[in-house]
Amino acid sequence: MTSQPIGTISQPVGTSGAASTRIDQRALRVVHESATAIDLAAAERAAAELLSALGIDCDTPSTRDTPARMARAYAELVTPRAFDATTFPNDEGYDELVLARAIPVRSLCEHHMLPFTGVAHVGYLPSRHAILGLSKLARIVEHFACRPQVQERLTTQIADWLNTHLDPRGVGVVIEAEHTCMTLRGVQAVGSTTVTSTMLGTLRDDPRSRAEFIALTGIQR
């Protein structure tokens, strides 16, 4: 993952009577190295070989294009979209929790290359300096989920990114997900979900702040 600063944008707001107030917003371009490393033609050939090795006939009307579809599908699952992580100065001095609940999560278990899906609850206690554009919390979740993953690492990567780039007083991330490597194969534990959490700063050290975060996520304890 690469974060490229793209400068400060000054945006005038308000036009009634007095001089316009100016808000300085900062944007960080976030890209992922794998976006340029995918060889679809090679992936299609490999998919065809895999299906053939599994005894699947790829020469029927229904399966003739399956290797190409597989290659495109997996490419989409491991290619996050670049985005601008826009932050704004915390001019209002807001010091309470900012929480986005039930952000959709879809990723690939790196052990079996089978999907896991669920929701992420992501929150932070702003510093006096910066707050993040609300939609960017979902973008950050997508960014780290679009690659072969394990849920534990995904949870900590989201929290660490926020902690590094926002310098907040606290960060909390909880992910609830169902893993098809558990529901479709092996133990076949249909309906089982896995919950992981990472708490940093005040949300880790202060029991009341931690309890408030957990309560607001709606996680059943």
Predicted regions and their residues:
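A domain-level signal for the structural core that forms small-molecule/cofactor-binding pockets
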Residues: 1-221
